[in-house]
Structures are given as C-alpha cells and as structure tokens.
Amino acid sequence: MLEELKSKEKVIGIKQSLKAVENGTVKTVYIAKDADEKVVNPLKELSKKNALEIIYIENMKQLGKACGIDVGAAAVCIIKDIW
C-alpha cells in the first residue's frame, strides 16, 4: 500500500490534494490519522463526494516518509494514470 506512494505520481499536502480532487485527477487519497481534523475535513468530504478511496495512515511522519520527504504530511493523493 505505501509502496504506491514512492512509485506513483502524486501530490503532497492539503491544498494540492484539494486542487487535484476538484480537478478530477485523483485515484486514491491518503490521510494521516493524527492530522488536525479542521485541516483534513474538507478533503475527506470532497473525496467522499467524488467516491474516492481514502486510506488512513497512522501518522503524518510515516506518510511523509513514505513519500520520500523528511517532514510530515497530512494528506497525499495518487494521480490517475493518464493512459
């Protein structure tokens, strides 16, 4: 599951994730369980509205590390394959 975060095209962070979901380019949404609810709720709601799969990861540090960054991430979205 987390291997996908290293190998696939993705966007990292709440703002970029919201934009990607609004644009209809997202396949899967990953959200850290320890992220502030006020921050991630808009993404959760929009993802549910668009019938996207949401996968919850234990914490922001683990989600960031899985993406190959040295800081935590509240949310990450995997972009749909274009072809």
Locate each region found by the language model.
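Ribosome large-subunit tunnel/peptidyl-transferase-proximal elements
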Residues: M1-V26, D36
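Signal for well-folded cores of large energy- and translation-related assemblies
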Residues: K6, E22-T25, K44, K48, ...
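Feature captures the catalytic cores and cofactor-binding loops of soluble hydro-lyases/lyases
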Residues: A35-K61
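Glycine- and other small-residue-rich loops at beta-strand/loop junctions that grip anionic moieties
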Residues: K6, A32, L52
